[in-house]
């Protein structure tokens, strides 16, 4: 877990999200829960640059059926949506407990249903790349009628996981209201 601590994750955050370590796979293990707090999947995240693939999932785990941290975020009217679980953990660490992750750049119909069911306001904090732009557009298209905001990641950084707590707070406080067609 030292790798995550070195990347700015606090011990308290790792404990809050019940992060573990697999000696057998030499990976960080991240549990994923459903709205009823039941563990529905495990993510094995590579900790070394040479490890491929970067993510391993337990057999039968369907990422498209869940939003990471939905069990906690569902208590709020507003949600911050990130792509990765580590991004969501970093945003939560910055004080935004109403954060979820889609566990990939694709947003599924089931994920959209959950977003529409639980939240009135949606803050899109997608990665700073082409896939992140596609994710942002998909959420905007599927969540019309909700209050929609977008967050900009500073140039030179890829995702919220690369940001400091101060940068995350500043980015979310300066979110842009989405109005009309997104280009």
Q: What is the meaning of each model-derived region?
A:
Residues 81, 119-131, 152:
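Acidic beta-strand-to-loop metal/phosphate-binding motif
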Residues 114, 138-142, 167:
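Alpha-helical scaffold elements adjacent to nucleotide-binding pockets in ATP/GTP-utilizing enzyme cores
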């Amino acid at each position: 877990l030292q790798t995550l601590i070195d990347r700015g994750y606090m011990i308290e955050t790792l404990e809050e999200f019940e992060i573990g370590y697999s000696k057998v796979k030499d990976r960080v293990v991240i549990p994923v829960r459903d709205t009823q707090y039941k563990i529905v999947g495990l993510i094995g995240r590579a900790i070394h640059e040479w490890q491929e693939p970067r993510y391993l999932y337990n057999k039968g785990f369907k990422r498209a059926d869940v939003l990471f941290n939905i069990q906690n975020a569902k208590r709020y009217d507003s949600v911050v949506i990130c792509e990765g679980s580590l991004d969501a953990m970093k945003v939560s660490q910055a004080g935004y407990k109403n954060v979820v992750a889609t566990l990939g750049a694709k947003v599924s119909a089931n994920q959209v249903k959950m977003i529409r069911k639980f939240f009135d306001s949606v803050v899109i904090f997608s990665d700073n790349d082409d896939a992140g732009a596609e994710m942002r557009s998909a959420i905007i298209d599927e969540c019309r009628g909700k209050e929609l905001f977008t967050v900009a990641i500073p140039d030179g950084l890829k995702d919220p996981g690369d940001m400091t707590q101060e940068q995350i707070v500043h980015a979310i406080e300066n979110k842009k209201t989405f109005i009309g067609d997104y280009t």
